[in-house]
Amino acid sequence: CLVGSEMCIRDRCYVSWTNDRTKQVILDNIHRSPLYAGMIEGVGPRYCPSIEDKIMRFSEKPRHQLFIEPCGAETEEMYLQGMSSSLPEEVQIAFYRTIKGLEHVEIMRNAYAIEYDCCDPLQLNATLEFRDYPGLYGAGQFNGSSGYEEAAAQGFVAGANAALKVLNRDPLILDRAGSYIGTLIDDLITKGVTDPYRMMTSRSEYRLVLRQDNADERLTPIGRKLGLIDDRRWAKFEKKQAQKEAEMKRAEKTVFSPTDALNEVLVSCETSPVTTGVRLSELLRRPQVTYADLTPIDIER
């Protein structure tokens, strides 16, 4: 955990697959799907198509995977990830019950399809404010994106900037090099969309440095400036950064002799032994060697 205490709350998720019977039920009723009856004409999300879309577009596939996920810690409801559908209720219950593990399933809330309009995100500034309508901010599907995290990220940026504008403070603008939120917004406002936009690591040219293990280093100072990081958390962050900087300096200065003990550790890590002195920092650059691996020989740690 980066700045808080560890959380070990876990629950089981399950995997299952559709089969030939599932496919047949859907094909027999495909004419009842608004997606294929001409009632919905918009371009759907590319990365989470409905089950009938999967069956029709990938007819050569013998089965499709789905995830069965608990909706919460205090409910027996399960969410079927990968099984969205626009088919009628009786068809849904019929094809769900063809799937292994769901033979006796009951539906709490049916799957459904929606079609909605969105604005052209090219009209937006980096603050998510409309250029032609000062004071109006957009976020989420309204901006042409798809997904919960994408909507939440934009909602945060739009809301923060609306508040900052009222307070007459500098806006919050996240760039591509510092966050995936910055990449998401930059793509929307400079490239526009032809189908619902989903954020993926492959969209960022900085993905090697936009990692979860340095998220606090990249974003905590911004949060502090906004007033979202209290003194206790900021002190903890500064302490961690100071320790990290000191350890990196020590790694550059610490030199190990080519002893048998060192080479035994290196060989056990399946990397080549050394014949001359070597810096700790150089050993840590080897992909096979972790910081913990060198504990037995790094007596100054």
Language-model features: where?
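Short, small-residue-biased leader/transition segments that mark boundaries at the very start
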Residues: 1-9
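A glycine-rich phosphate-binding loop feature that marks nucleotide/adenosyl-phosphate handling sites
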Residues: 42-49, 110-119, 172-188, 202-204, ...
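A glycine-rich dinucleotide-binding beta-alpha-beta segment and adjacent secondary-structure elements
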Residues: 67, 79-145, 173-186
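Mobile "lid/hinge" segments at catalytic clefts and subdomain interfaces of large enzymes
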Residues: 185, 193, 197-225, 230-234
